[in-house]
Curated annotation (Swiss-Prot):
SUPFAM superfamilies per record: 6-phosphogluconate dehydrogenase C-terminal domain-like, NAD(P)-binding Rossmann-fold domains
Single GO molecular function: pyrroline-5-carboxylate reductase activity
Annotated organism of origin: Caenorhabditis elegans
Gene designation: pycr-4
Pathway(s) the chain acts in: Amino-acid biosynthesis; L-proline biosynthesis; L-proline from L-glutamate 5-semialdehyde: step 1/1
Keywords, ordered alphabetically: Amino-acid biosynthesis, NADP, Oxidoreductase, Proline biosynthesis
Entry EC no(s): 1.5.1.2
One Pfam family matching this protein: F420_oxidored
Protein name as annotated: Putative pyrroline-5-carboxylate reductase 4
HAMAP family: P5C_reductase (MF_01925)
Catalytic activity: L-proline + NADP(+) = (S)-1-pyrroline-5-carboxylate + NADPH + 2 H(+); L-proline + NAD(+) = (S)-1-pyrroline-5-carboxylate + NADH + 2 H(+)
Lineage, top ranks: Eukaryota, Metazoa, Ecdysozoa, Nematoda, Chromadorea
Source organism superkingdom: Eukaryota
């Protein structure tokens, strides 16, 4: 469907999505929007740094592609802006934004940049601007992402509820989305955003262990990946008999562990080597790093 966004002047018209940044995450989100029929290609505007990148987008059928951010933002003064760049270049984005701009709706897809910093660093943000933080993950590229979203409730902002609903639908184009308080954003982002890398390491380790015992590499990789996928589906699928809201993961583990069997022996080895502690520390480390990035940007 084409998105019709109610504007504060009372009119209703199709408003473009302006992506500031056209890297991997922007590509995943845009692809998801197209796959879900969320908004047409003609309604997508993309700002990139090089002509080579711009040409790649044009070859995919996107005509509204710019290498000059200021020119793009001046031309699209009424839009839903999606800041999809690395935090390190955020200041450059700010300096490229027209000072007389008064955006109504901004979606930030930047790790470690809190709402307070966004409000402070974007001097043109008015009291009528809805800012949403959104953090998808790499699985968004196949429509299986786990996104985290937060915003600051402000009843003075016209149409904020409709903006938030639109942001949720936008995020759901690439998977699931959890709306959470910002104080929980960094640990949630560590789980949703960073954990795929750790999960790849886990799958790789499973395969390596089997290869060490003589199993072929290809078979080991397929079995390991499918085992992890199946375990996740058992957690999320109510048909498995597991209730994620009320039951402990240990009940699923216990289903597999027979007394004196091979699985419980493997659990013992994992516990001996600090498996759970290592995973917990990875989440804490990623979350702490995001906190440090936020403090650095706030200076």
């Amino acid at each position: 469907m084409t998105i019709d966004t109610e504007l504060t002047n009372g009119s209703s018209e199709s408003v473009p999505f302006v992506f500031i940044g056209g890297g991997n995450m922007a590509a995943a989100i845009i692809k998801g929007c197209q796959n879900k029929g969320f908004t047409p290609k003609s309604n997508i505007v993309i700002g990139v740094q090089t002509e080579k990148s711009a040409e790649k987008w044009r070859q995919l059928g996107y005509k509204n592609v710019f290498t000059n951010t200021l020119e793009m933002l001046e031309r699209y003064s009424t839009a839903i802006y999606v800041i999809c760049v690395k935090p390190q270049v955020f200041e450059e984005v700010v300096s490229s934004w027209p000072v007389n701009s008064r955006p109504e709706f901004i979606i930030s897809v930047m790790a470690g940049v809190p709402l307070k910093v966004l409000n402070a660093k974007l001097p043109f943000v008015s009291g009528n601007t809805t800012i949403v933080r959104l953090m998808p993950n790499v699985a968004s590229s196949i429509g299986a992402g786990a996104s985290t979203m937060c915003y600051e409730k402000n009843e003075k902002i016209m149409n904020q509820d409709s903006h938030i609903e639109l942001a949720r639908e936008f995020a759901e184009c690439v998977g699931t989305v959890e709306l959470i308080p910002e104080r929980c954003f960094n640990p949630a982002m560590a789980i949703g955003g960073s954990s795929p890398a750790w999960t790849f390491m886990y799958i790789e380790s499973l395969a390596d262990g089997a290869v060490a015992q003589g199993l072929g590499r290809a078979e080991a990789k397929r079995l390991a990946a499918q085992a992890v996928l199946g375990a996740a589906q058992m957690v999320l699928n109510s048909n498995s008999g597991f209730d994620i809201e009320t039951q402990h993961f240990g009940s699923l583990k216990d289903m597999v562990c027979s007394p004196g069997g091979t699985t419980i022996e493997g659990v013992r080895a994992l516990e001996k080597n600090g498996f759970r502690y290592a995973v917990m520390e990875a989440v804490v480390a990623a979350s702490t790093k995001a906190d440090e990035m936020a403090k650095s940007l706030a200076k």
